[in-house]
Amino acid sequence: MQGLKVMISEEEITKRVKEIAAQINKDYSGKELKLICLLKGSIFYTVELSKYLTMPVKFDFMTVSSYGSGTKSSGHVKIKKDLDESIEGQHVLVIEDIIDSGRTLSELLPLLKEKKPASLKLTTLLDKPARREFDVDVDYVCFEIPDKFIVGYGLDYDQAYRNLPYIAEIVE
């Protein structure tokens, strides 16, 4: 059985998400924003962030993965669920749970740009720059973390731990 060590508390997450929302509110003042939640891991961050956004928002969802089961990236990016609506001419914010190698987003963002949004920005709850293999420009980062396998607040280990209200490291 693995144990969990809290890395980022629920209170720390809420505080930082409010700070990110304040910056997004400033950047998109007077505009409508389309939020693209990358399922499943980003759902917690998307919901929390959207509560503090003051502009009109619309939601869409994608399922994109480079993970199979376990803790390592499979090296293959799959779009399992595409957008339901066009993003042409809209201001779009892609919401990610964690950026590891950058492979998924390095392939996804160019595909989204082809759909001709008015603007396209990216936010992530967690960033692991030590693992980066592909260049990804991230506009809003909540937390930079070390190269540890973490769970909670939407992130899972074989579909478990997703419901934790905090970010934890799995320890042996």
PLM segments and residue spans:
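PRPP-associated nucleotide enzymes
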Residues: 1-172
